[in-house]
Design a protein with these regions (language model features):
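Elongated, amphipathic alpha-helical interaction scaffolds
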Residues: 1-144
Length: 144
């Protein structure tokens, strides 16, 4: 498979995920964007959900949103989708970079953006053992 075919397949998976979210969530007033640039000339984030016209997710929206998203109070949700690889340090740093850039470009406070990684494969035990859940905000940190 050449690079162009790989790129096309990659984009199709992201468009498919975005379309699923769009079909489910647009009727309940959530804007869905795919291939969303986090800043001019940069790589594109995979999927962005933006809650519109209300302070919290409505019950109808919560019923359609997946675990890990429905309970957030953030009105912007950045989704990094890995259809063929598991979560690893590079994927984590990529998602965090997109998050940082999006916050800067949109001039948002961090609590307004929730970042999620969706992966088709379970992370390796070595990776998960190298990170631990800590603190009352349940943030992941690298084990020392």
């Amino acid at each position: 498979m050449n690079a162009n075919e790989t790129d096309t397949r990659y984009n199709l998976w992201h468009k498919l995920l975005g379309k699923i979210f769009e079909e489910l969530l647009t009727p309940v007033n959530i804007m869905v964007k795919t291939g969303f640039p986090v800043m001019a000339g940069s790589p594109e984030a995979d999927v962005l959900l933006i809650r519109r016209n209300q302070q919290r997710w409505t019950e109808a929206q919560r019923n359609l949103l997946p675990d890990g998203i429905r309970d957030t109070q953030a009105d912007h949700v950045l989704i990094e989708f890995k259809y063929s690889e598991s979560v690893n340090q590079n994927v984590l740093f990529q998602a965090l970079s997109y998050r940082h850039l999006y916050l800067k470009v949109k001039k948002l406070k961090p609590e307004r953006l929730h970042t999620v990684i969706i992966s088709s494969k379970t992370p390796s035990k070595q990776f998960t053992d190298g990170f631990r859940l800590s603190g009352e905000r349940q943030a992941w940190s690298m084990a020392q």
